[in-house]
From Swiss-Prot:
It is an enzyme of class 2 (transferase). This is HPr kinase/phosphorylase. ATP binds at residues 151-158. Its EC number is 2.7.11.-, 2.7.4.-. Both phosphorylation and phosphorolysis are carried out by the same active site and suggest a common mechanism for both reactions. It comes from Staphylococcus haemolyticus (strain JCSC1435). The Walker A ATP-binding motif also binds Pi and PPi. Mg(2+) binds at residues 158, 200. The lineage of its organism: Bacteria, Bacillati, Bacillota, Bacilli, Bacillales.
Amino acid sequence: MLTTEKLVKLLKLELFTGEKGLHKPIKNTDISRPGLEMAGYFSHYAADRIQLLGTTELSFYNLLPDEERHGRMRKLCRPETPAIIVTRGLEPPQELIDAAQEMDTPLIVSKDATTSLMSRLTTFLEHELAKTTSLHGVLVDVYGVGVLITGDSGIGKSETALELVKRGHRLVADDNVEIREITKDELIGTPPKLIEHLLEIRGLGIINVMTLFGAGSILTQKQIRLNINLENWDKDKLYDRVGLNEETLQILDTEITKKTIPVRPGRNVAVIIEVAAMNYRLNIMGINTAEEFNQRLNEEILKKGHQSKEN
């Protein structure tokens, strides 16, 4: 659970008062700048958000009659408000200090510009409050593409990852991949701390990839873009031989491209994954070889059809 205390510590912010409220949970990634509230309109006040007070808000507040000031700040400091932050190194008004102490609302000061701090807070909150899950598989950075290798236990995922690392690519996680959905369409994979940098090879045991291959062979996190699912070759199954069939894998609320690779002796799976990653990069650049081939094939069929009619 993310608390105001953790926010202050990780972002190196300065607590001015309200230390009794540091245990308050932060559940919302949105940040509010209470401009209308400064004018007295609290009908739709988002009290569960972090409140940012900058030059604009405090300049308007200073224009208010003395008899309205304390009541205005008292309404701003609610029991569910995780924190109020005064930016640009401004001095918090005494009425705000009194209200924060009365309601145990953490009052934080920062020298950062309001928009700059809002950007930092949003990025931090989206990361900390992101939806999470974990998957059995291996995550490897192949030519800059985060490739999640999945498949049944014993299919050869870790051995394939080892071959990819030997070929200059980078391991992120083996066996268990922790995944955060930072924003929609952005999945970040990380390794569990216990098995970070480690790779399990059956018959060999656990190896430390960073020790064996150097710091350039590992990453601590990577955006997942492509799923390669390994399965034993089924002679009765029709596998995609052209590349027109688009499979996807849904993780949380995000779908990523999925490719199923049949495994059997003689197939170099690591090379196939390298080509799949390069082909994925071409696809997002707008170059689709399968569609180009299909278009040429259709044109050739139409051409021969016209020739047959003419004859």
